[in-house]
Amino acid sequence: MKIIYIHQYFKTFTEGGSSRSYYLAKALVANGFEVEMITSHNSRDYVCAVIDGIRVHYLPVYYDNQLGFLGRIRAFIAFMWQAYRLAARLKNANLCYASSTPLTVGITALLLKKIKGIPYYFEVRDLWPLAPAQLGIIRNRWLKKLLFRAEQTIYQEAATIVALSPGIASYIRERNPGKPVYILPNISDCVFFRKEHKNPQLAHKYQVGGKFVITYFGAIGKVNYLQSLIEIARKAQQDHCHELAFMVVGRGNELRQIQAAAHKYNLKNLQFIPHLSKYQLREVLNVTDAVYVSFAPYPVLETSSPNKFFDALATGKLCITNTRGWIAELVQENECGFYADPQKPDDFLAKVSYYLADPEALEQAQYNARQLAETSFSRHLLINRFLKIFETKVPAPAIMTALHN
């Protein structure tokens, strides 16, 4: 069976960012499927490479988190058309697996179905256009109406939908009753990431020896709301909480603004680290005690399935989230961290002080995080669930029952 897998932001294991599509595509290849991955890169030329059995087509579409709204839209549209033209030339494809965001990836899949007769599965990582609409990024009511109509058509025409969180699945099921919808969250790589003792050499390298380290890693944009972490670090410095150190790892179009705020407050307890590879990130997480998962206070963002959270679980870190929703519920139910109101730095510091004062409680929470990763989100477990979707002899409703039991 030949599958066209479309993901604009495909990353291999050695690159920074989410490796979800790499792992899923690799699993398909290992189970006898032929996979043609269509993605993009920032080079000027088309490149085709075979990576662990996956034939990866890199289209020359520039994209960076620093891009503004119009720049991103141009990149989305360019990739949509280039991906369609390439996919339409691939022979003997049986199925398209399209992973959003952006929503335009779904339009590529829809065109393949309508013009080439290739059915598609649609993976929904974020609710788009609901997210940019709630955040006020898309304001024109006619454009919003057009995008929501396109979203609904993509859902209706998909043979199957894969949602990355319960909230996303509920949203889609309400609008598409009877449509097969699978919940397949992001993956905790419990093989690459492990719960480790702090390495003194790494603590010295990052100048955090003897500190309780709280780390944010990932994109730095409007949706990530890192102003909240700046205010926490500011309050900690004002209150002479010298035990605390903060690290921000990543890049994005609000990085300069966040750095300017840190400079304005003369924060000595916070450092910025550029975007890292997986191996470099593992070093930073070795010296980290708690990971901060941050989103702006919009309801749609409560449905997110942030890759950073699952990496934090795998490394056995105290998980702190400033967003309500299924992640906060998971953290609280499994006693591996806490929710902290982003508008109340005092609340954050009070909750952290409990773990500062009780190392055994910290160790237990970190152990619970690793256990949650192993029992609910491990690569082996979720890949097996993913592969069940492609068991053609099993009707989709039967697969759904199997996944929920």
Regions found by a protein language model. Give the residues of each.
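N-terminal subdomain of nucleotide-sugar transferases
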Residues: 1-55, 60, 231, 236, ...
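Carbohydrate-associated surface elements
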Residues: 41, 167, 186-187
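Membrane-proximal helix-turn-helix segments that form the acceptor-binding/catalytic region
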Residues: 84, 104-107, 111-115, 141-163
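Nucleotide-activated donor-binding/catalytic signature segment of Leloir-type glycosyltransferases, i.e.
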Residues: 241, 249-250, 256-283
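A short, well-ordered alpha-helix in the C-terminal region of glycosyltransferases
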Residues: 347, 354, 361-375
